[in-house]
Regions:
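Short, charged, low-complexity patches
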Residues: 4, 8, 12, 79, ...
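Glycine-rich phosphate-binding loops at beta-strand->alpha-helix junctions
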Residues: 99-122
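Conserved phosphate-binding/catalytic loops in two-lobed NTP-binding clefts
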Residues: 120-146, 154-160
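Structured core elements
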Residues: 22, 50, 107, 131-132
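Phosphate-binding glycine-rich/basic clefts of nucleotide- and phosphate-handling proteins
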Residues: 1-76
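Phosphate/ATP-binding catalytic cores across multiple sugar-kinase/actin-like superfamilies
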Residues: 74-101, 147-150
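Residue-level signature of catalytic and energy-coupling elements of molecular machines
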Residues: 11, 86, 108, 144
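Active-site phosphate-binding and catalytic loops of NTP-dependent enzymes
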Residues: 21-25, 90-98, 154-158
Length: 160
């Protein structure tokens, strides 16, 4: 399982390894929001982002600028894990559901789904249409609520 928190950790690690700068989780989260991307060829790329942190060599605070392309590179391994999990799930999908997915596409939900270009990258990998759910931050909770209200209709989804 890979989620937005993994992306944040990837960014922290990238800043430490590539720029010798120590940043906190909040700064990494802000980088993800401001310049986070899943691909390095966005049609409308964000401007570079100024990052402030502590220089690991001198211990003195410093500022650097990072591009969305750098962040896309830093997130590549985690995004590849997501792609592989999706492909694995598709391989195990019953034929009737596969037909529906082929027709309607894949829907992404959660905060990580808002990463620029993630839908495009997954679409290229799966050769299927990929959409971001309406209100992706609340989509999973809303869907779970609907399923619980109609538990008899969704009993087949519950593992014993």
């Amino acid at each position: 399982r890979v989620a937005g928190d993994d992306f944040t950790s990837d960014i922290e690690e990238y800043m430490r390894r590539q720029h010798n700068i120590l940043i906190g989780e909040r700064t990494a989260e802000q980088i993800k929001i401001e310049v986070g991307a899943a691909i390095d060829n966005l049609e409308n790329p964000p401007n570079d982002y100024a990052v402030r942190g502590r220089d690991l060599m001198t211990g003195i605070p410093k500022e650097i600028h990072v591009s969305y392309k750098e962040i896309a590179h830093s997130l590549d391994k985690s995004i590849s894990k997501i792609e592989e999990a999706i492909l694995s799930a598709l391989e195990m999908t019953p034929p009737e559901l596969s037909a529906d997915i082929y027709k309607t596409g894949i829907y992404l939900a959660g905060g990580g789904s808002m990463l620029r270009g993630l839908d495009k990258r997954i679409s290229i990998k799966t050769k299927l249409p990929v959409h971001i759910a309406e209100d992706p931050l609340r989509a999973v909770a809303r869907g779970t609520g609907i399923a619980l209200k109609n538990i008899d209709n969704y009993q087949f989804l519950i593992k014993a």
